[in-house]
Curated annotation (Swiss-Prot):
Other information: The sequence of the A (or alanine) version is shown. The S (or serine) version differs in only two positions, and the K version in only one. There may be other versions in addition to the S, A, and K versions.
Gene3D superfamilies: Nucleic acid-binding proteins
Family classification: Belongs to the telombin family.
Keyword ATP-binding: no
InterPro entries: NA-bd_OB-fold, POT1, TEBP-like_OB2, Telomer_end-bd_POT1/Cdc13, Telomere-bd_alpha
Top-level division of the source organism's lineage: Eukaryota
This protein's name: Telomere-binding protein subunit alpha
Known partners and oligomeric status: Heterodimer of an alpha and a beta subunit.
Function: May function as protective capping of the single-stranded telomeric overhang. May also participate in telomere length regulation during DNA replication. Binds specifically to the T4G4-containing extension on the 3'strand and protects this region of the telomere from nuclease digestion and chemical modification.
Coiled coil: none
Region of interest called Disordered, as start-end residue ranges on this chain: 1-31
Length: 495
């Protein structure tokens, strides 16, 4: 018989039933009958040995990272109605926020924070004062757990995947196999979500002492944080995007962003970059280097700071204009912009559009896509033939050479293109600019006219052709799939 069995066996035929002591860290009913009794951040006891349970709003976070062979870590800044930044400029003391440090033995057991303003629920955390600040510690590999709730209608993941919102009491990510919510938590969550929106709409939340202006980046000796607007997302290769950033100081910087790590970055978004360093080796342009623990975080829709910077920071394209004047541009230049209604549309590779569209269920369900490519050739090669006469009765087009000028004129141009996903194959792909139905009519910002007669229009289009086929020039376009072809729409050249 095992030792455990011997210890459990009674020494008498009749013995009193003993109540087993609860396992340390295990959930138990509170005096009010709830499984967990939630505490506000400023009211959590520093002297109690009991585990703490709480809801909080996340305002900043590192990306989960490995500290040694057996441990991963993630550090968050959290607030609630009892502990938050109460002024536009922080006092720099412990009254602005608490920190939450989560530990795990696996990367996937830690939360990935993509957006400031979302809500986290933590069970079984400990509390201590660290450098005068409240620090909650949660060991997920022991007994702690967490769950993330979206403050906006949809989570970042749902927005990326174009998924419908689920119940506002359902977490979009959590550490355990299952996540449940009790009735008493519903009001806590709803009230905190309401407070978070009011807080972010009334305060900057990320105060000016919590980040570095880009015009002072070069003077920084170590890591620093940044708040900036993404002016451009350029697909550098199949795994990496290059972000063009500009902040309120007017400085423009670039940084590399892994697609898998930061799938949520979009042109026009205001982001907080956690932990960047200045690249001393870059001579052609100013660059920020991101570390394995660096994070790029967007803001909830009600954010006052994001709205102000989104309106204030504009792209004057001076860097691109200077690059295009050079014989060889060392900076990638995206020559186009898409209509604002497609701003949140994720980018789809040419590989997916031309090789997987008929087999992928998600792609089959769509007819409008956003894609980025470079142009290797334009057909017809004679610019004068880019505009055709179009007979709407017969639905046939014809050359305008020698034509009287009556009837409808349309652009009929084919771009032979490639992108990072098709870089290594021998194929080129045709993307069409056929404007008979109005799609892409404003792409060139030139009216479709008889180019055999209109020399001014022809010269503008010849200049556009040169830019489109220039090294390091790219097109960011919205395309519509029709009868197996992809036609450009809601896209225009900006140079």
């Amino acid at each position: 018989m095992s030792t455990a069995a011997k210890q459990n066996r009674s020494t008498s035929r009749v013995s009193k039933k003993k109540t087993a002591a609860p396992k340390e860290g295990a959930a138990k009913k509170s005096d009010k009958g709830h499984k967990y009794e939630y505490v506000e951040l400023a009211k959590a006891s520093l002297t109690s040995a009991q585990p703490q349970h709480f809801y909080a709003v996340v305002i900043d976070a590192t990306f989960p990272y490995k500290t040694n062979q057996e441990r991963y870590i993630c550090s968050l800044k959290i607030v609630d109605p009892t502990l938050y930044l109460k002024q536009q400029k922080g006092a720099g003391d412990a009254s602005d926020y608490a920190t939450l440090v989560l530990y795990a033995k696996r990367f996937e057991d830690l939360p990935i924070i993509h957006r400031a303003g979302d809500i986290i629920r933590v069970h079984r955390a400990t509390l201590r004062l660290y450098n005068g600040q409240r620090q909650f510690n949660a060991n997920v590999f022991y007994s702690s757990s967490w769950a993330l709730f979206s403050t906006d209608k949809r989570s970042v993941t749902q927005e990326i995947n174009n998924q419908d919102a689920v119940s506002d009491t359902t977490p979009f990510s959590f550490s355990s196999k299952h996540a449940t919510i009790e009735k008493n938590e519903i009001s806590i969550l709803q009230n905190l979500r309401k407070w978070a929106n009011q807080y972010f709409s009334s305060y900057s939340v990320i105060s000016s002492d919590m980040y570095t202006a880009l015009n002072k980046a070069q003077a920084q000796k170590g890591d620093f944080d940044v708040v900036a607007k993404i002016l451009q997302v350029h697909e550098l290769d199949e795994y990496t995007n290059e972000l063009k950033l500009k902040d309120a100081s007017g400085q423009v910087f670039y940084t590399l962003s892994l697609k898998l790590k930061f799938p949520h970055v979009r042109t026009g978004e205001v982001v907080r970059i956690r932990s960047a360093t200045y690249d001393e080796t870059s001579t052609q342009k100013k660059v920020l280097i991101l570390s394995h623990y660096s994070n790029i975080i967007t803001f909830i829709q009600s954010s006052k700071l994001a709205k102000e910077l989104r309106a204030k920071i504009q792209d004057d394209h001076s860097v691109e204009v200077a690059s295009l004047k050079k014989n060889v541009s060392l900076n990638a230049v995206v020559l186009t912009e898409v209509d604002k209604k497609h701003a949140a549309l994720p980018s789809t590779s040419l590989q997916d559009l031309f090789h997987h569209a008929d087999s992928d269920k998600e792609l089959q369900a769509q007819d409008t896509f956003r894609t980025q490519f470079y142009v290797t050739k334009i057909e017809p090669s004679d610019v004068k033939e880019w505009v055709k006469g179009y007979d709407r009765k017969t639905k046939k087009s014809s050359s305008l050479k020698g034509a009287s000028g009556k009837g409808d004129n349309i652009f009929q141009v084919q771009f032979l293109v490639k992108d990072a996903s098709t870089q290594l194959n021998n194929n080129t792909y045709r993307v069409l600019l056929y404007t008979q139905d109005g799609l892409g009519a404003n792409f060139f910002n030139v009216k479709a006219d008889n180019l055999h007669k209109n020399a001014d229009a022809r010269k503008k289009l010849e200049d556009s052709a040169e830019l489109l086929t220039k090294f390091n020039s790219y097109v960011d376009a919205v395309v519509e799939r029709r009868n197996g072809f992809y036609l450009i729409k809601d896209t225009k050249l900006i140079y």
